């Protein structure tokens, strides 16, 4: 459904005028035990496999600057849940849950799972609880700060006849589950609390830098679940500051990484950032990491949305955006590669810890996956060189001789032209080596010290340069125009002189 229509129905169900009034109204409605609002919403949107609330919060309320909120696409959320092993899980922790996009895709696969959803932004928590209650889930929602470990509030959702019953409870001190799924804020700054190095998350691997919390989220997931999959920017896979490199090295050496999956770019509506699925496993049965490159495995969808602000020329206009998504077949291929430890050229490679060590613990799949060389088809080098020289000959037919000062005033980059014919050009030397022939030197411009010199010279005895022909045509057209203008003023002068001459006012 188009966003404007969806927003209108949402405001109607909640009986609000402004979207900013939604969070308190949702909490008031769903914690009162009255299910009329939930029932009305389901009447509008009976397909609970879709997260309708996500697009509303993302467009109107998401904080992309400080909290780095950019919500997960359905196909990427499904890929995350599937690779985490949600189908066999009894408990699932959605870390940095947002409005519940990841949890909803996990719930679509395993409705019997118990979900624990933790989120820091108290504005989105009502949307999250609303989404879970709609689906009659058994769950705990935590208002907490994953990075600092602080937990402020919690709500328990218990499945009933139609919708979950909601009750506020004391926040749990720890989380221990079968699987963790997460799309945390990317590259976010954070603060080290006193004695944080003693925290269970960091005492083995060290503290990630305050400049970037990516590895803090990774380590938080690692201690919370038997298996975890995080959607992260692909910058986590290599380089980084020293502490990040050391953490990555330690995680690899401790055999905690199950697989690394490189995603296509443009999978999010608000950013083109390239991401990966960072898959962790505390109970691996082998010592290999499966690297998968999905960057070229996708289909495209076009989303349509009316303009939301401005005049009618904007609000009546349909804006289109194309995004990349995974098909069900794409996700299945990914899952099979992870399970079977597949080696497929240009797609997947199962690599040992020793292999990864040889690449200085880089986790970039492209360093491990076999690249297939395909001989490119092209014309003979001599033919290509002949065409290049043909162009050079045509350029050289017309030579511009111009004073340096005048050339600079006209915008010529003198140094660029002077460097064109350097004798040690590597490309020129390579071409001569391959073909046995030389590139024709450029001789179509010359800079002089002669004051005001500006000359076009035909450099060929056999023909006239096409450039000069064009210049002459333009010159002739402009002279014709000036002649017409001159004749107009001569006629005006004649008509002015004639009466005065005839009257004797002026003497010839």
Region spans (language model):
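Class I S-adenosyl-L-methionine
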Residues: 1-110
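Alpha-helix N-cap/helix-initiation motif
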Residues: 69, 117, 206-210, 240, ...
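Short coil/turn segments at secondary-structure boundaries
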Residues: 69-73, 347-351, 443-446
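A generic structural signal for residues located within well-ordered alpha-helices
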Residues: 72, 213, 271-273, 485, ...
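Conserved S-adenosyl-L-methionine
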Residues: 74-182, 187-191, 233-235, 246-247, ...
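A conserved structural/catalytic subdomain of Rossmann-like adenosyl-cofactor enzymes
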Residues: 155-158, 174, 181-413, 417
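Amphipathic alpha-helical coiled-coil/heptad-repeat segments
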Residues: 374-508
């Amino acid at each position: 459904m188009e966003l404007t229509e969806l927003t209108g129905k949402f405001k109607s169900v909640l009986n609000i005028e402004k979207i900013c009034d939604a969070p308190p109204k949702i909490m008031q409605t769903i914690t009162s035990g009255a299910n009329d609002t939930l029932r009305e919403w389901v009447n509008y949107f009976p397909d609970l496999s879709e997260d309708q609330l996500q697009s509303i919060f993302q467009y109107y309320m998401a904080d992309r600057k400080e909290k780095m909120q950019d919500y997960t696409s359905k196909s990427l959320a499904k890929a995350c849940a599937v690779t985490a092993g949600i189908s066999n899980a009894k408990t699932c922790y959605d870390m940095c849950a947002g409005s519940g996009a990841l949890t909803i895709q996990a719930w679509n696969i395993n409705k019997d799972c118990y979900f624990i959803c933790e989120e820091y932004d108290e504005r989105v928590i009502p949307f999250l609880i609303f989404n879970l209650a709609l689906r009659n889930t058994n769950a705990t929602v935590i208002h907490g700060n994953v990075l600092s470990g602080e937990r402020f509030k919690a709500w328990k959702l218990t499945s009933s006849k139609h919708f979950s019953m909601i009750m506020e409870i004391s926040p749990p001190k720890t989380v221990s589950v079968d699987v963790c799924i997460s799309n945390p804020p990317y590259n976010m700054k954070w603060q080290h609390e006193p004695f944080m190095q003693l925290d269970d998350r960091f005492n083995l691997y060290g503290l990630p830098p305050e400049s970037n919390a990516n590895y803090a989220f990774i380590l938080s997931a690692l201690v919370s679940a038997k298996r975890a999959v995080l959607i992260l920017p692909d910058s986590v896979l290599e380089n980084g500051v020293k502490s990040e490199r050391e953490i990555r090295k330690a995680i690899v050496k401790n055999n905690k990484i199950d697989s690394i999956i490189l995603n296509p770019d443009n999978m999010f509506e608000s950013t083109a950032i390239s991401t990966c699925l960072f898959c962790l496993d505390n109970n691996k049965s082998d010592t290999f990491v499966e690297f998968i490159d999905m960057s070229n495995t996708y289909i495209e969808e076009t989303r349509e949305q009316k303009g939301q602000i401005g005049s009618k020329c904007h609000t009546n206009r349909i804006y289109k955006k194309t995004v990349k998504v995974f098909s069900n077949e794409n996700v299945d291929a990914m899952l099979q590669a992870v399970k079977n430890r597949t080696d497929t050229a240009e797609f997947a490679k199962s690599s040992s810890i020793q292999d990864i060590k040889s690449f200085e613990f880089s986790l970039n799949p492209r360093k491990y996956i076999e690249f297939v060389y395909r001989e490119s088809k092209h014309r003979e080098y001599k033919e290509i060189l002949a065409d290049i020289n043909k162009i050079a000959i045509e350029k050289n037919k017309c030579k511009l001789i111009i004073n340096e000062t005048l050339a600079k005033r006209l915008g010529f980059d003198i140094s660029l032209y002077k460097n064109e014919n350097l004798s040690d050009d590597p490309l020129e030397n390579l071409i001569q080596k391959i073909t046995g022939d030389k590139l024709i030197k450029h001789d179509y411009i010359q800079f002089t010290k002669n004051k005001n010199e500006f000359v076009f010279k035909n450099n060929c005895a056999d023909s006239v340069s096409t450039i000069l022909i064009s210049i002459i045509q333009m010159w002739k057209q402009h002279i014709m125009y000036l002649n017409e203008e001159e004749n107009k003023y001569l006629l005006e002068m004649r008509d002015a002189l004639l009466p005065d001459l005839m009257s004797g006012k002026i003497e010839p």
